[in-house]
Curated annotation (Swiss-Prot):
Keyword vocabulary terms for this entry: Cell wall biogenesis/degradation, Hydrolase, Secreted, Signal
Gene name as annotated: lytN
Function: Probably involved in peptidoglycan hydrolysis.
Domain LysM: residue ranges: 175-219
Keyword Hydrolase belongs to the record: yes
Protein name: Probable cell wall hydrolase LytN
Origin species: Staphylococcus aureus (strain NCTC 8325 / PS 47)
Positions of the Peptidase C51 domain: 241-378
Cellular component terms (Gene Ontology): extracellular region
PROSITE patterns according to UniProt: CHAP, LYSM
Subcellular location: Secreted
GO annotation, biological process: cell wall organization
Endpoints of the signal sequence: 1-49
PANTHER family according to UniProt: LYSM DOMAIN-CONTAINING GPI-ANCHORED PROTEIN 2 (PTHR33734), MEMBRANE-BOUND LYTIC MUREIN TRANSGLYCOSYLASE D (PTHR33734:SF22)
Induction section of the entry: Repressed by MgrA.
Amino acid sequence: MFVYYCKECFIMNKQQSKVRYSIRKVSIGILSISIGMFLALGMSNKAYADEIDKSKDFTRGYEQNVFAKSELNANKNTTKDKIKNEGAVKTSDTSLKLDNKSAISNGNEINQDIKISNTPKNSSQGNNLVINNNELTKEIKIANLEAQNSNQKKTNKVTNNYFGYYSFREAPKTQIYTVKKGDTLSAIALKYKTTVSNIQNTNNIANPNLIFIGQKLKVPMTPLVEPKPKTVSSNNKSNSNSSTLNYLKTLENRGWDFDGSYGWQCFDLVNVYWNHLYGHGLKGYGAKDIPYANNFNSEAKIYHNTPTFKAEPGDLVVFSGRFGGGYGHTAIVLNGDYDGKLMKFQSLDQNWNNGGWRKAEVAHKVVHNYENDMIFIRPFKKA
């Protein structure tokens, strides 16, 4: 019984040992697996971290590359007038360097590489990655060329604007005047609405009293306005009228035959007076033709009678064909407002009463009514 008991105990102990051994094996296995997984996980994390570091470095370089491209594009799209030919973008682990010094020299094409240097702290060996960025090279080339063109256009634009401004807003304000006989600087200055000193300074004239015939002077580009004729004062006008009346008084009470034909005609008296003023007689088949047969542009002014017209002493009055048997009549005015109502005037006449052809009617004073068809000729000269 004892033996049996011991045998049974031995068997039970053996079974318990197997169980413990199995548990130990399982524990060791689990531990080994755990250690293996731990080791595997640690290596994976390290590799993954290292890979991330490398990826970060590369990504950082790529982002800098993109940033450089975008910056160039921004410059191209906005200013297009300045591109930095030398620049460096640096980080702690990555350097991105763009060298464009030779990009536009001698018109050579740009062939530029971007070098990214990657040297992780935990790596004993540096890895160099060279990227041939043709797209960025092309962008830089275009940007540089466009910058050159833009600068050239700006230069041309400024030049064109300058000449346009000169042509349209700063055009020369002077013209050339040729000095004529009798000219003086003061007279020229008056004619062109400027001053003698201004003409002197413009033409470098030291002595304002010394100019020469044919000399070219720069004068202001202003419309020529001739000086207004001096108005004759009432005193001067009275003196002129007095001198005319004094001369006409010498013709009164005498018979005049200017052409030697048909006696003392009205036309003869007027021709004597006009010859005294201008040295020649007047043309016309009859007295009524005088205003149309002669050129009075430089000698007199012609007036047609109106209700407000007033003749002056020395004016010629021409009657229409209603008088003188169709030939008209002419006389020399002495008083243009004889009645004070502008209804009558007084003149010096000859042959008014048809006695001149017989030389029986001398020049004498006659009062006439103003007629609608009368014409008056006022000489510029006074007797």
